[in-house]
Amino acid sequence: MPTIPSRPFRVLFLCTGNSARSQIAEAILNRLGGGRFVAESAGSQPAARVNPLAIEALRESGITWAGHPPRGLDGLMDKDWDFVITVCDKAKEACPIFPGQPVVAHWGMPDPADVEGDAERKRTAFFDTVTLASRRISLFLALPTEKLAKLALETRVRAIGEVTMDEPAAREG
């Protein structure tokens, strides 16, 4: 990304099933990106449906879900991505090489669908995922993308993947 595109930055979020984490990240970035970013999401092994708790957590957080079912990478490999961000370890391992040399980063998040326990505990896990994704995306949006060289930008985008629930949503860069 040596030059600033004349279009919004394109971001692809990847996870295994495209049923929770990547869908959540896509919805949040599209809500907060202010037209500067356009996000999509996909899975390496798409699930049959989006987890209803992911949709509920987004809705109750005031974020509109895109409404698309889980999908794979078909039709997405030839798009001109500026950023490809994996949000689960399995997707990181299976992440293909995209044309155009996008900035690739890993923002691993626990799978909220793996949480066991009662309904409230499961629901809380999805809200925690929305909170963590929102914090990371806020940091991402604070990066001065127009002023950073590709290598510096890639380093900073990757570092966002280390942000935890306990850190503030935005910090000086």
Segments predicted by a language model, with ranges:
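Short glycine-/acidic-enriched loop or helix-start segments at secondary-structure transitions
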Residues: 23-25, 51, 92-97, 116
